[in-house]
């Protein structure tokens, strides 16, 4: 069985080697085959290896009632890739719980809303949060919690 780390390394190597041959390969929908299943039906790269256009369901596919991360994968190190469409098929297979791909909503740890400055309480008293002098992004950067901007897109 392939690990997520091995799969990502292979995907990057294929992308690199194909780029060196000046051939474009879309690896967005490619997943590593497991249990002897071969990914087929996509663009063929040098050497006749098909690397895109197919996804392979793992045996015992993840469902809402059995949603769990692969026990052999440290999914916490891949959380930054959860929203990257290029890695979605792999992360759905190996890290569905960590990345929030389980049915019934996200099971990923919620992002904590905090102030990065210790002066926010004083700044709020002085009108920082309601001031038009500072843009939303600055207010959110320093005092997201105090200014109640945690769920606001600036």
Swiss-Prot record:
What's a BP term from Gene Ontology annotated to this protein?
Answer: innate immune response
Q: Which residues form the ShKT domain?
A: 67-102, 113-150
- Which residue ranges does UniProt annotate as crossing the membrane? none
Extract the coiled-coil ranges from the record. none
| Disulfide linkage | 67-102, 75-95, 82-99, 113-150, 120-143, 129-147
- What span is annotated as the signal peptide, if there is one? 1-19
InterPro entries for this protein: ShKT_dom
- Cite the entry's keywords alphabetically: Disulfide bond, Repeat, Signal
Tell me what this protein is called. Answer: Uncharacterized protein ZK673.1
């Amino acid at each position: 069985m392939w690990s997520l780390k091995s799969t990502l390394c292979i995907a990057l190597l294929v992308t690199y080697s194909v780029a060196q041959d000046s051939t474009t390969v879309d690896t967005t929908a490619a997943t590593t085959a497991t249990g002897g299943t071969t990914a087929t039906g996509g663009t063929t790269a040098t050497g006749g290896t098909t690397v895109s256009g197919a996804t392979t369901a793992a045996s015992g596919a993840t469902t809402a009632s059995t949603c769990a991360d692969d026990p052999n994968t440290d999914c916490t190190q891949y959380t930054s890739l959860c929203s990257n469409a290029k890695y979605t098929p792999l992360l759905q297979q190996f890290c569905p719980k960590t990345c929030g791909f389980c049915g019934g909503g996200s099971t990923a740890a919620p992002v904590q809303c905090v102030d990065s400055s210790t002066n926010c309480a004083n700044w709020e008293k002085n009108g920082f949060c309601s001031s038009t002098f500072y843009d939303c992004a600055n207010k959110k950067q320093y005092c997201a919690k105090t200014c109640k901007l945690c769920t606001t897109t600036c």
